Amino acid sequence: MDNYEILETIHKSKTGETIVFKVKEKNKKTCDKVYALKLIGELNNRFQKLMFKREVDALKTLNSCNGIVKIRDYVLNAEFDGKNDCGLILLDYVGGTNLEEVELNQFSQIEKYELCLKIFKAIEEAHNNNVLHRDIKPSNIMYNVETKEVKIIDFGTSKIKSIVEQETTLPFYSQNFSAPEVVKGNSTTEASDIYSLGAVMFFVLFNMLPNGTKMICKTMDDLGTTEILKNLISKMVAEEPENRFQELAPVIDIVEDLIGDNKPQKDTYLCSVDIKKVELFKENFINRK
């Protein structure tokens, strides 16, 4: 991808194995289009390269999904900063603010529900395409305050990173938002993503970091949360995967109901009209004239 110019570094992992740059095409002075270029490497053997390609190809199937950042291209065997055989992924650059930095206390309750609904629908589309995120957390959710658009980033790349990171003894999970089975090093499933979404919903609604199932449930009890909301989040973040929702469709239905219940209702008045009395009134009015 020599035809792209690096504008700035957006992110660099602690090990330095993953770097994200903001880039633009060279020799296109009139074009303001920018992209995100993710470098992952080195891919030291055939197995790592095969897994990298398989994962990126799977993620490209999400390009038609709403709310998910799109992959434009990728390269194997790239050279960067003295490293050979690096993997490069070119993605759409997503503006806005990540959810970790959004002023959620400025949102109304219904706006918070609508935000969660957009996130859930994006992840549902991915699940319907047999792709898991594996690292759902506020910093991987971008929000545009003006357009209210939501974009999920870093989609599925936690598995790619786990293939190439040198410090393989480090667990790949996010504090506060990963499911218990993921923290223990077990396989990620749809139920694991649903746990993370429940933790994100708790973060959005209550503006505090979740810290495990017990803390989430106790906080909701202490705050007098409504039964429907408490039951929803509690089931999403259940300790055991089998006790959670196994798909997002029922979660989305409940959130849509919550939005409907919280929307201000316009007053509607029903009345019946006696036509004979109306005609009599008209006659009396005319006679008075």
Specify the residue positions occupied by each region the protein language model found.
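Conserved HxN/HPN-centered segment at the entrance to the catalytic loop
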Residues: 64-76
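Regulatory extensions appended to serine/threonine kinase catalytic cores
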Residues: 263-289
